[in-house]
């Protein structure tokens, strides 16, 4: 049930989701501005706390992963980042937007210290698995703008957050 291949597959999916979710706002902001009655330059600062949390939060989440449970931390990652993306899609005020983006950053901060440690623990061919994991993270980066743009164009910016949050 907990085979190394299965665990590594979930960790790779998490890396994809981690980077994908952090960049939805960067693409969606183009259509969000007019919908919210705000200029691009007014919306940009709302992303900053989430990106700070994405980096700085890794200190706490790595510590928790070592002292508590990496597996449970990854469950929190999947549930938390999904709920946070849905929350962004439901915001009504700029303050709510900032809080929801901060939440994405906090949950995204779990992946790198915890997921990477899991790969090290489960991989037989560490270099190969780390390389593949890097590909999955970069696929999240590469696909975020395209998928967000398509969803935002046809369904609206809110769905660009809600759909991946549900998935």
Locations of the language-model features?
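Pair of pore-lining "gating" transmembrane helices in MFS-fold secondary transporters
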Residues: 2-27
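Residue-level signature of mid-helix packing/kink "hotspots" within the transmembrane helices
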Residues: 23, 50-59, 141-142
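Extracellular/periplasmic helix-loop-helix junction of adjacent transmembrane segments
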Residues: 28-55
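Interfacial helix-cap and linker-helix signal at transmembrane-aqueous boundaries
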Residues: 32-33, 64-65, 150-155
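Conserved MFS/SLC helix-loop-helix module at the cytosolic interface between two early adjacent transmembrane helices
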Residues: 56-92
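Paired small-residue
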Residues: 84, 95-103
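Cytoplasmic helix-loop-helix junction between adjacent transmembrane helices
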Residues: 100-138
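Helix-loop-helix hairpin linking two adjacent transmembrane segments in secondary transporters
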Residues: 133-167
């Amino acid at each position: 049930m907990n085979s190394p291949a299965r665990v590594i597959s979930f960790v790779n999916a998490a890396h994809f989701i981690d980077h994908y979710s952090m960049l939805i706002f960067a693409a969606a902001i183009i259509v969000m501005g007019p919908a919210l009655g705000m200029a691009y330059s007014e919306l940009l600062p709302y992303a900053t706390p989430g990106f700070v949390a994405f980096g700085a939060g890794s200190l706490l989440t790595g510590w928790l992963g070592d002292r508590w449970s990496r597996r449970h931390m990854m469950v929190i990652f999947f549930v938390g980042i999904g709920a946070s993306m849905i929350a962004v899609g439901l915001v009504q005020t700029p303050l709510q937007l900032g809080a929801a983006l901060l939440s994405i950053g906090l949950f995204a901060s779990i992946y790198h210290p915890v997921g990477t440690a899991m790969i090290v623990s489960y991989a037989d061919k560490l270099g190969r698995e780390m390389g593949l994991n890097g590909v999955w993270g970069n696929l999240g980066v590469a696909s975020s703008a395209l998928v967000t743009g398509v969803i935002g164009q046809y369904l609206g910016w809110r769905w660009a957050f809600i759909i991946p949050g549900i998935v």
